[in-house]
């Protein structure tokens, strides 16, 4: 099934991922993630349904603010039933591509 791919607004702190206009991203499939790391090693934990929601994936980053990471998920991507919450640690920014 073909779906349009959208890009979220970049997120620099813990919180719900938002679309480019600041709106909520509800049920969706995350197809890819773009992470700009900070100077130290860090991580991004994606949860379904807020700060205490189920962990869908944890992505660890290497130290180095000049080496961004682009990660594509196989198949149809990761399904988030409620919303997409990102818990960022030592990461400059994170952005998702979803549909």
Each language-model region and where it sits:
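C-terminal interaction-tip segments
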Residues: 1-26, 38, 87-99
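Surface-exposed coil/turn segments at beta-strand junctions on protein surfaces, enriched
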Residues: 25-26, 66, 79
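Core-facing hydrophobic residues within beta-strands of well-ordered domains
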Residues: 28-30, 41
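Noncatalytic modules at the cell exterior or secretory-pathway interfaces
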Residues: 31-33, 76-90
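Short, surface-exposed beta-strand/strand-loop-strand elements in extracellular ectodomains
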Residues: 40-57, 96-97
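Solvent-exposed serine/threonine-rich low-complexity stretches and specific carbohydrate-binding patches
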Residues: 56-64
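Exposed aromatic-hydrophobic patches
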Residues: 68-76
